[in-house]
Amino acid sequence: VWYRNLGTNSPLQPITNYQLPITNYQLPKEVPMTRKILIILSEWGYWGEELIGPLETFDAAGYQVDFATPTGKRPVALTPSMDATFVDPPLGRPVVSQEMAEKVRAIDDPNNPRLNNPISLRDWLPEKPYWSSPKFLREMEAYYRRLEEIRAKDLSQYDSMLIVGGSGPLVDLVNNQRVHDLILNFYQMDKPIAAECYGVPCLAFARDINDRKSIIWGKHVTGHCLEYDYKDGTGFMGANVNPNLGDINFGPPFYPLEYILRDATGPEGQFHGNVGHEVSVIVDYPFVTGRSTPDSYATGQRLVEVLEKGLRRYGW
């Protein structure tokens, strides 16, 4: 481990004064050492604390973790997420403590091997064929056969999956068929699925090809609310970004996530923005969703409680 793990008796640290948003959390007793979590990260930039928070929680619980990215490239943290002077425009305050900035820089350091050689989703999971393919039927049969093999041999070893947020998922996770297939298989296997910030819309678009119905229909979720959206400064970075282009700024996000989640949950579900609350984490099994950066530790903590205490509902 390249950074100090949080102790199980860490004192409450309020988000005011820009301290780490750590709750007075204690791990469940007799936590088994055999849990394994699959963590999905964007190759276009993830928000540092949204990895560090859950990861430190999993480490403290003795969990094993595997990392995966769309093509197997090493993920890179977004620069503002390791800058303690960065002021989040919608919140009007710094959102990165000095301690967190150091932790993010440590795990982002190329000399730190922890994020090296992530699983390549492209190499691991099959691609769904085009309908226009002359061998469509045979290719679809092979596609489903391969998914069944992966489900039986690979996915059975995982207890849960987590999709880390940041602006990067907008580019290569939200509309990624292989990410959708992972989510659907975890869902069908009744395994908890956690997502943070702009990783949450992956849940809205993971739909069975037959009924095409949202799997969060009728569910309660949180995510990046409209009040938290940038008017400018939505940036990306990583191995896919051409260095000759300089800083990439798409202005506002590609879409208002809140509207997508409100529509995807339907009249019997609900999106919870919890504007004005410092932390917003919702558990509606099998989904654990975190709104944004300050919710990172709490998202990991609720997932541990889902796995160890049978938590099925929280925050609504």
Report the location of each language-model feature.
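Short, basic, low-complexity termini and linkers enriched in Ser/Thr/Gly/Pro
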Residues: 1, 8-29
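Generic extreme N-terminus detector
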Residues: 5-6, 251
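Extended, subdomain-level signal for the structured scaffold at the beginning of enzyme domains
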Residues: 33-189, 202-316
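Glycine- and acidic-residue-rich phosphate-binding/metal-coordinating active-site segment common to enzymes
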Residues: 192-193
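Aromatic-residue-lined binding/catalytic grooves and analogous aromatic/hydrophobic interfacial grooves
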Residues: 197
